[in-house]
Amino acid sequence: ISGPWSDFFRALGAVILYLMTSIVVLVERGNNSKGAAGVLGLCAAGLFGYDAYITFPSGTRRHTAAPTDPADGPVR
């Protein structure tokens, strides 16, 4: 398991869980603390979404191959 992919799926799973929980809390009518918890959960989901966004491209970048020919001509 590669590091960037596992970090991406960790952040993606957190986004899904926070979104589901926050939407359920916001849909239920209750006191103001439930509303605040739902809004803070949506903010946390946004932060985890941003983390997933910046993590995914860093794992897909490729490095250029190192040159194999000597720079000053063939070796004798």
Swiss-Prot record:
Keywords carried by this UniProt record: Glycoprotein, Membrane, Transmembrane, Transmembrane helix
Subcellular location: Membrane
Transmembrane segment boundaries: 8-28, 36-56
Membrane protein topology class: Multi-pass membrane protein
List of glycosylated residues: 31
Function as written in the Swiss-Prot or TrEMBL entry: May play a role in cell differentiation in the intestinal epithelium.
Annotated protein name in UniProt: Proteolipid protein 2
